[in-house]
Amino acid sequence: DNLRYVFNWNKKRFPEPKQFFDEMNARGINVIVNLKPGILARHPYKQWLEEHNAFIKTPDGSGDYYGRWWGGPGRFVDFTSPSGRDTWKALLKKHILEMGTKTVWNDNCEMDGVEDREAQCDFEGQKGTMAELKILHSNMMAYTAKQALHEVYPGERPYIINRAGYAGIQRYAQVWGGDNLTDWRTLKFNIATILGMGISGCANMGCDIGGFAGPAPEEELLLRWIQNGVLQPRFCLNSANNDNTVTQPWMYEKMLPHIRAAYRLRYRMLPYLYSLFYESSQDGMPIWRPLFLEFPQDPQCYGDQSLTFMLGSSILVASVVEKGAKTRTIYLPNGSTWYDMNDDFRPYTGGQTIELPVDLASMPMFLRDTAVVTMTEDIHHILKDPLRHLDILIAAENDSTFVWYDDDGHSEQYKDGVYAKTAIAVTAGEQTKICFVAQGNYQSTVQSLTVKLISKDKGAYWVALDNTLLKQFIIQDDWEAADSGWYYDL
């Protein structure tokens, strides 16, 4: 009947779900299944759910509560109830996870279909109302998914994404901003939303690129959304339109070169982004940071409304968010020198507002004078391509530190020390000293690295590695072909 019955496979579209997952996994494609907590009246598993007392109740507790749902009235699993969680977990394991996927996508988990604020929740046997407990359901739905993933795939790192969450959701799931409107205003709102979530403790956040309600995005809007989106902690072009069509980048042929360049930047920056995720997991620092978080002594940063932000502590990002823009107004925080990453690292003194010319290819980004950024050209497919060569971009006007973090990307062996954590300490001065201290038992796939040190005032006289002078090359091709050495790029 073409209705949405969660956990029930459409055998016309997916005659062999397990075989489908096996084939996708063999191709290196992670498939994530969209799950919603509402149960329609004709759901094939409704009797089993009823027998296990899995639903939210009416205010007097005499029966199951029915509310608005996709395709008609539905009941809603009570995630404050041990029975509700266990029943959901059993269905999730049998019909989804054991078929071959290791990921869970919890949608509509804000429980807006339960409109009666007095509807009754179990709350571990203590009873309570939706008015009191609604905010807990999304977290407990993610918690239940995490338990299920651990039970089906012990030793594997769980990946869960939630549309909603309360304080603490970052312990269980990545989140996104829900169904957003397709317009230029939303692009700006999305940046503010991610920044706000980050300083609220939820760093692993993103928004649907291209919009999820409204007409198909115009080509310039989609491009600017992607150019910003590739730097979001969660990057996903998940765009649908009111005419029931979807948005894909290859539909915008004129913009494809710029879209490819943006995607490529995301992959180049994965070592830096992954390290920022690690940092966030340790001390809660967001990946996207409002200017005032990095520059609390600069009053201008508190009032800046230009949607400029820091990506980690090293890179200032000023995405182009105005239709037809020819320039981008950017405030560069005081106390630092800033290097334009798209203009041969042209330096700018901090504490000033600049007007930067932009075109469709522009993704304005500035390197801070204490920056340490790890990048690579190796990765085109995250699950297949090993990291062989690492580029480390350093601006050493002042002392700085950075932790480059790496592990296998999927298991929980990092909890037992199977990781590679390299502390990079830069001491600025007439002689710039860069110290690497490695920790952990992970056998890194990195075989070589290039340190790119920005020096606009004067070139290096010599370079040494462990007190051994390295050979200087005059011709770049000779330097690139050598096992070691240094080269000054004029």
Tell where the protein language model's regions lie, with residue ranges.
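Surface-exposed loop/edge segments in extracytoplasmic proteins
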Residues: Y339, F345-Y348, A460-W462, T468-F473
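Generic alpha-helical propensity signal that fires on short helical segments
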Residues: R13, Q47-N53, D122, W176-N180, ...
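Accessory, solvent-exposed terminal regions and/or long lumenal/extracellular loops of proteins
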Residues: L367-T468, D489-L490
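A generic structural signal for beta-strand entry/edge sites
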Residues: A325-T327, T353, Q431-C435, S448, ...
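Catalytic-domain carbohydrate-binding cleft regions of carbohydrate-active enzymes
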Residues: D1-S362, R368
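Extracellular/luminal ectodomains and secreted, surface-exposed scaffolds of diverse proteins
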Residues: T468-L490
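Intrinsically disordered, low-complexity acidic/polar segments
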Residues: L40-R42, I169, K326, T374, ...
